[in-house]
Amino acid sequence: MKRFTVCCFSNPIHKNKNHNPDKKLRNSMEISRNDNGEHAKQNNNNNVTPIIGSDRTNVIVNHDFSLGTHSWHPNCCEASIVTGDSGISHGVLGPSKCGSYVVVKNRKETWQGLEQDITSRVKPCCLYKVSATVAVSGPVQGLVEVMATLKLENQQSPTNYQFIAKTCVFKEKWVRLEGMFSLPSLPERVVFYLEGPSPGIDLLIQSVTIHLESDPERERQEGVTVEDENLVVNPNFEDGLNNWSGRSCKIVCHDSMADGKIVPLSGKAFAAATERTQNWNGIQQEITGKVERKRVYEATAVVRIYGNNVTSATVQATLWVQNPNQRDQYIGIANVQATDKEWIQCKGKFLLNGSASRVVIYIEGPPPGTDILLNSLTVKHAEKIPPSPRPAIENPAFGVNILTNSQLTDGTTNGWFPLGNCTLSVAEGSPRILPPMARDSLGPHEPLSGRYMLVTNRTQTWMGPAQMITDKLKLFLTYQISVWVKLGSGINSPQNVNVALGIDSQWVNGGQVEINDDKWHEIGGSFRVEKQPSKALVYIQGPSSGVDLMVAGLQIFPVDRLARIKHLRRQSDKIRRSDVILKFSGVDASKLSGATVKVRQTRNSFPVGTCISRSSIDNEDFVDFFLKNFNWAVFGNELKWYWTEPEQGKLNYQDADDMLNLCSSNNIETRGHCIFWEVQATVQQWIQNMNQNDLNTAVQNRLTGLLNRYKGKFKHYDVNNEMLHGSFYQDKLGKDIRVNMFKTAHQLDPSATLFVNDYHIEDGCDPKSCPEKYIEHILDLQEKGAPVGGIGIQGHIDSPVGPIVCSALDRLGILGLPIWFTELDVSSINEHIRGDDLEVMMWEAFGHPAVEGIMLWGFWELFMSRDNSHLVNAEGDVNEAGKRLLAVKKDWLSHANGHIDQNGAFAFRGYHGNYAVEVITSSSQKVLKTFVVEKGDSAQVITVDLQGL
């Protein structure tokens, strides 16, 4: 069996991953094979030599100092040339063996060294490779660092410094320093320089080269880059491990393993990442210079696992990106549950928003001690998928129940069957009225029969009545579920009752309720099927074994979205519009009588915002869409504690600062999400490990640090996220901690409205967070003195049905607090249906008087928390769902045309917000003025001064 190995050694570096806030700081030093077979110690992300076509013209003038110090300048120090015949030695290889070199001496600071202006010889967005031969002389003890750096100067902004590379140098030995850089834009002046050793140590430089490695613009013009070109070199290991390295572990090339039981799925070889001590250890390749920003790539890896008695584990493809400002970013491309039995494909897409000085793709994931096997890896420009057409749904039969014998009118359970060995029978005495949510959808309806199914002899929670509905479902139709349920006597604890659907092997939640009494309860839910199932059934389940279940009037019917929106338009007119009378002054009324008036609303005051991320704002196209279409923002992760303090005492507010600066400079209001997160899985390990006293101190420091830093800058704060679903801080610090968090936050920033925030409030799917539980939770906080000022409904919803959402809003509205949808997203594989869902949710919010704003949880493909939920494709094309967003927002703008009456006035009815009015007199004189229609129920009289017309 052939074996080739590459080894490495590691120390901890920071890995900032959204999906895993507990990654620790780590640095990696690896030993990788170089061209002559020797091994050299290098940084973990510096050990791959990219194989890229290049222009060999050297950017550096006088690269070998054969012209003395021509074009070179010492930076606040001195420099002199040592030639081969000088007879001078600095303890390194003699000049006769290495030729001329420069000595940089009398250095008083580490940054002092030798520099050259290269402004006229570099271009933006190109990749350059730097190679320098350096040494040190003088009072050297141990290793000395030498660095290559760029100084970027602009007259109108502070000087920036871009790190290129560094190497460790021993005394009396020449060492090669290599690295790469790319400039996203060209500053007024670019200076390359070498620096680094401690003061008093001389820096010796034999030669410096900077070569163009990649010019994307030229390659596009010459047709060098083709759509199906694989960016990965040696993707199938036909050339052994060339161009590959271990990410802080050893990698081995095999043609077989396990006595021939493991062989390549394709090709003749595969690689194994072995001796892994961290889950992020794996196999990697550098693809710097090959990846264009704002372009979508698809990565496909064929993987499996081996060893350590692990038979199944998550394997992930990840991209490490280093930006020119040295900010690291980790992008999760795809993950798959791999086994030790067979090869499996791990496939996903990625996009770089900003410029990158380094890009490395690697495979990671399984627990330490388990080998990752990689058969092949490809990275190609992703094909554009054409949008799917709107589904053709014939005869949707809105409001028609698809179930058989729902009313049990013949006194039998015909059409139903027991799931399990329970017993079904028919009894009388159930409600004859429709459940409220169904009544809102169906309107006037004949009474129910009053009969119900009694389910007895239940020995498992899943036992209950069931019915096959495979042939009755239509793809892409949204169905509403409605039923009355009741439990038999003898229950001694709260019981969940659930309407469930079995769609092939998938469980679908059709609604749940918690019951702790002997009354009838409504269950309301919804679902949609987007792929033809081979088997579909509906069943009712949930109570403990031995508890009898009663089911009455179960209905499943398609909902008429357009009819609901028509109703919501009328409702919105009542609460979001006002009668407006424009009174024109400053000009004689007789001159204005009959003048033409054109009123155009420029901005609706109803807040519509979105989630953004630090990496996204590096993408100009993203920022353009964001600023044009949203007036509020929330940060996806960058304000969360696990992001701002991943390790104790190591604070990172820079990302949040950058995002806040973008928003404030463009008059975008912001929500602060979130100060704390009550779910334990989201809490950093260093916090989880604290004792009670230390944790209490850390909580107070978090409040003080965050709220003082951003005082007055965030309009809202989600104080302690998802308290209905988590209890970490309450369990550790007692019940009063939640109230104290609110009190302290209010003391530190009285201007901010403090919100509770949770999920599954509006969809009937989770008894833990039904509106009644949320109300109870809020009242409990308020009674103990917590200044709760707003209700956050996250809104991660599937197949929304208006009356179900509205029912939750009505119940929460009794508290009199402003309600916001704080993280709204919808999902469908069909863009048109996704747009339908978004339209439903936007109108339900806009049409309800208790709702005061909507925040989308993102809009850009590859930067969403849910699949098939984006509104704009990754390369900037607005899809059908995005077009629906724009159409709804356009509907929320009022326009009016007419003439000024004899009293110098013009009346219209319009949505609240900002307006422009153009007045054109009979003599064709024009004037343009602006005004604001404020919220209010009564008619508003607004004076418009036309003086000067």
Q: What is each model feature region?
A:
Residues 2-15, 22-609, 616-629, 669, ...:
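Extracellular and organelle-lumenal recognition/adhesion modules and their flexible linkers in secreted
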Residues 208, 377, 554, 751, ...:
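Acidic/histidine-rich catalytic cores of soluble enzymes
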Residues 308, 632-646, 655-762:
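Substrate-binding cleft and catalytic face of glycoside hydrolase catalytic domains
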Residues 357, 604-608, 629-631, 666-670, ...:
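Short, well-ordered coil/turn segments that N-cap beta-strands
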Residues 565-566, 571-573, 687-690, 695, ...:
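Aromatic-rich peripheral "rim/lid" segments of glycoside hydrolase catalytic domains that contact
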Residues 607-613, 719, 741-771, 820-823, ...:
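Aromatic-lined carbohydrate-recognition surfaces of secreted/lumenal glycan-active proteins
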Residues 611-621, 641-654, 680-681, 724-734, ...:
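Acidic-and-aromatic substrate-binding clefts and catalytic sites of carbohydrate-active enzymes
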Residues 614-627, 697-706, 768-781, 835-844:
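Short, acidic/polar
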